[in-house]
Structure formats: structure tokens, C-alpha cells
Amino acid sequence: ELFHQENINIAEAAFLYENMLVRVDIIEKKGNVINLIEVKAKSWNPLEDSFLSKQKNTSATNSDIRPYLYDVAFQKYVVVRALKEMFPHEQFTVHAYLMMADKSRTATVNGLNQLFKVKTTPEGRSYIETAPNAMEIVTSIPLSKRVVRPFDVDEVCDNIIDGQYAEQQDQEFMIGRCFKKHVEQMATDYCNNKKSDCIIGSKCFSCQFRKKPNDSDKMLDGYCECWKEKAGFDPFKEKRALIQDLNGQYIRKDMYIKGLKY
């Protein structure tokens, strides 16, 4: 219904295409031009940083910002197709942006960081406390001088969706699948309540589905499930020293894991 308006801004806009659902941080609609803006708590220097890898003879995205690029690329993939289904007779143009802090700009407001303070509830949840005059101060800053601004990643997103970057051939990144096949397979697995296939490696040691030592025994642990299936043992019950416990900048943990040394 909101999309029938000529110009409108929508926060947390939801789009559904087949089995894929996304919530876009900010949708800016100007006629038939849709600006898709994903806000990230990350700083970026356009004078020094690049969205693409600086390695010679390779066409790949910068690994430091790759998760963010694939996040917004997936959102664009869903939004473009959802709009075609919802408005078959309309022709929308979708542009993708990452909203980040620009390290090349100097703040024009003293104490800008004090306008938004991170607080913690008694339950341990974090929230942002906004100063009463924050909006007045922030909106008074000219667009050309704002520290937080949108960076155009539209072309990079299109190339990601088209499978043009080298990392999509990496078995450890997307199991060697191109973007479209990967997201379709992941959506199918999710709808069928099926655990997606994966390759174990040092990335597992920071797994977000890893149970903490003090958690209940009844809680599921995705990290242990994968290692039981792929390596044949439970890391929590293993008494021998594990690769994950080794410290050192130059220890090639993935090399050992590929050699079945865990």
C-alpha cells in the first residue's frame, strides 16, 4: 500500500519472494527509483579502502567487508524479484547502498558521540539512549559533511548476484555454488527444516550456534553437530588437545583440519 505513494521512506520494509524474506533497514522510494540502504556499524575510508580485493590477478570482493556486501546483495536479489511479482506492470530500478561511517570526513559537531549513548538494561540487553536534541543537531548538518553516509555498492551487488566473483568457487565459502543456486538451496533447506551441508574449518571456532560451557545440556549445539558428523567426535567430550586450542598468528589450522588432524 505504501508503494503506491510517489515518494516515501520506509524503515524495516519486508519483502517476500518465494521462500526468501528480507527486512530492509531503509527503503527510499522516489517515483520508480528504489534506494535500498543497509545500515552497518562499520567505518569505511573511501580514499584507502576498496570493496574489491587488491590482490593481483584475482576478481574477488574484499574479505573484510564481504559479509556485508553479500547481505545487501541478497536483499537486492529478493527486493527486485518481489517488486516484479507485486507490480508486474511497473518498472522499478533498485540501487543498493551500505550506510557506514566515513573515516575520511571530519565531524563538524563537537561531542557527536555523546548524542547516542549505549546503555544496558538490568537484564543485560543493550539499547541506545538518544539525547533530546540529537535529531535537531544531526539534521542540521549538511549532507556533504555528514560522517555517516551511504556508499554505492550497486554494481558490486549485481556482480555478486551474477556469480562473477572468485570466492563463489571456494568450497569453504558457498560450497562452490554460485550465488543464485546457493540462496535457493539455503531457502529450500530452511523450509524443509534441513540442516544445510557445510565444510568444517577454523571458521567453526567462532560459530554463532556454539553452546557455552554453562548452558543447559538440553540445548542444541550446531557446532558439535557439525563436528560429530564431519570429524566423528564431540569437541566438548574430547580429552585430547584440539587444534582449536592452539594460539599463534601463523598456525595454519585449516591446513591441519583438511589433513584430518583435529
Kindly label every feature range from the protein language model.
Residues 4-5, 9, 173, 177:
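Low-complexity, intrinsically disordered regions enriched in charged/polar residues
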Residues 113-262:
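Cys/His-rich finger/ribbon microdomains and the adjacent scaffold used
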